[in-house]
């Protein structure tokens, strides 16, 4: 398709450029904006109506005027030059290298606006992904092909958790090719330096592709970045048959950018000012996770978001929870106690956990052990609340054991060092060790055979 150039810029409003008399502009079409001083900037068509093209500019609008500005329509949507050589590299929000390395010699240029995986073509998620974190592996297991978000709050250690998962995540079969695609949106320069240093110093970068968008970068880059990251993941997973873990942070910043652009377009706002199509937009990102029938590759997603005001009913976590398959919740109360990573297992859930655990995946006792730990910890937390009213002296001896179990469970199971990588065997054995402080007769959720084989109770 020939590239057509127009000089009919009628208005500039915030990050948007309005170009008149453009009869055939296409939705998501890429454009080059040529200034009268010779400078060129990129943009993308957000909307077209009656010959008017609304273009979102990548970058500042400084220096762009209605006179002398030429807009060249490329006749194609955004495409990413892609190659296996992207592993070990760091890119900005639109896929340009920012690590001082050479340009990528593309083996292919792929459209970044890929569709969600066709349900008929999907294979059911299965197989365990080990993160090395007990609260996830033991009680909210991540399954290959799943989308499992992390719900956090401002000031909580979700950045450290993201870096730790990226460093430690693995599939148990060492013959499988595994890699991480990491995308960060709207982060500060300090956070960007933290992530790049962590990935480099720990060696995680060698099996990772990083995309970083700073808070000072254009909002449109935050909209494009997750799609670029997922396009990279799809190439590695479905063409190179690798197992890819995609970590996206912070999806709240993504939604804020969506709201900003929607406001600039003067669209009717939905809940709390977010666009009414935010659910659909988020689904086009989350539904790109999964496995394809007849293909050995897979894409597993861990989107991370901060809940404004720690409100889990806020539109961003609320809509994310509808689309994804569970959630891992980082607790402010546990964080105040000095417990890292501070995952609240009672508020967390992995809906696909049963498909990736048990005999042939992790260990035969995994499901029952997790249920027993949930039950014991919940009982201990209930007794904490009761103790605040009646005092510990009013509790029975058995109740006091559950009260102490809750404290021990938080200090030994939920708490672990940033560089502590626990195997699934270590996590399961630790669970049995903690349960040994409770009466064996109370173990109603684990099979007697498993108690006999794995239990740590002393024989009298």
Swiss-Prot record:
One of its GO terms (biological process) is proton motive force-driven plasma membrane ATP synthesis. GO terms for cellular component: plasma membrane. Its main location: membrane. It is found in: Cell membrane. Pfam families: ATP-synt_ab, ATP-synt_ab_N, ATP-synt_VA_C. Transmembrane segments: none annotated. InterPro entries: ATP-synt_VA_C, ATPase_F1/V1/A1_a/bsu_N, ATPase_F1/V1/A1_a/bsu_nucl-bd, P-loop_NTPase, V-ATPase_su_B/beta. Has multiple subunits with at least A(3), B(3), C, D, E, F, H, I and proteolipid K(x). Belongs to the ATPase alpha/beta chains family. Component of the A-type ATP synthase that produces ATP from ADP in the presence of a proton gradient across the membrane. The B chain is a regulatory subunit. This is A-type ATP synthase subunit B. It comes from Thermoplasma volcanium (strain ATCC 51530 / DSM 4299 / JCM 9571 / NBRC 15438 / GSS1). The gene is atpB.
């Amino acid at each position: 398709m020939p590239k057509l150039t127009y000089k009919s810029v009628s208005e500039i409003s915030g990050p948007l450029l309005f170009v008149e008399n453009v009869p055939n502009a296409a939705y998501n079409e890429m454009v080059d904006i040529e200034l009268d001083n010779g400078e060129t900037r990129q943009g993308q068509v957000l909307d077209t109506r009656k010959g008017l093209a609304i273009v979102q500019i990548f970058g500042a609008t400084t220096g762009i005027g209605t006179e002398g500005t030429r807009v060249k329509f490329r006749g194609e949507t955004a495409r990413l030059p892609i190659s296996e050589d992207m592993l070990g590299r760091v890119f900005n929000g639109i896929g340009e290298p920012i690590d001082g390395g050479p340009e990528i010699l593309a083996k292919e240029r792929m459209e970044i606006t890929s569709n969600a995986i066709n349900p008929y073509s999907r294979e059911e998620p299965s197989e365990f992904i080990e993160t090395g974190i007990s609260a996830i592996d033991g009680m909210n297991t991540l399954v290959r092909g799943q989308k499992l978000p992390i719900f956090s709050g401002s000031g909580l250690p979700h950045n450290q958790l993201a870096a730790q998962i990226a460093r430690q995540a693995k599939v148990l079969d060492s013959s499988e090719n595994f890699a991480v695609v990491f995308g960060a949106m709207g982060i500060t320069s300090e956070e960007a330096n933290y992530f790049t240093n962590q990935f480099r110093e720990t060696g995680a970068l060698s099996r990772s592709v990083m995309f970083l968008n700073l808070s000072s970068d254009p909002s449109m880059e935050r909209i494009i970045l997750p799609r670029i990251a997922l396009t990279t993941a799809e190439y590695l997973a479905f063409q190179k048959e690798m197992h890819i873990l995609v970590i996206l942070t912070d999806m709240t910043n993504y939604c804020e950018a969506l709201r900003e652009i929607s406001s600039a377009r003067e669209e009717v706002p939905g809940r709390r000012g977010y666009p009414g199509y935010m659910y659909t937009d988020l689904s086009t990102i989350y539904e790109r996770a999964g496995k394809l029938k007849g293909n050995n590759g897979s894409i597993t997603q861990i989107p991370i978001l901060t809940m404004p005001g720690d409100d889990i009913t806020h539109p961003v976590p609320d809509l994310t929870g509808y689309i994804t398959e569970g959630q891992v919740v980082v607790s402010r109360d546990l964080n105040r106690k000095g417990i890292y990573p501070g995952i609240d297992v009672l508020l967390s859930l992995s809906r696909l956990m049963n498909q990736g655990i048990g005999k042939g995946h992790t260990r035969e006792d995994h499901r029952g052990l997790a249920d027993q730990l949930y039950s014991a910890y919940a009982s201990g937390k209930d007794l904490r609340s009761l103790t605040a009213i009646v005092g510990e002296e009013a509790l029975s001896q058995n109740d006091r054991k559950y009260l102490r179990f809750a404290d021990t469970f938080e200090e030994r199971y939920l708490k672990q060092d940033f560089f502590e990588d626990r195997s699934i065997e270590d996590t399961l054995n630790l669970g049995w060790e903690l349960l040994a402080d409770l009466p064996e007769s109370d173990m109603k959720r684990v099979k007697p055979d498993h108690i006999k084989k794995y239990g740590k109770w002393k024989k009298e």
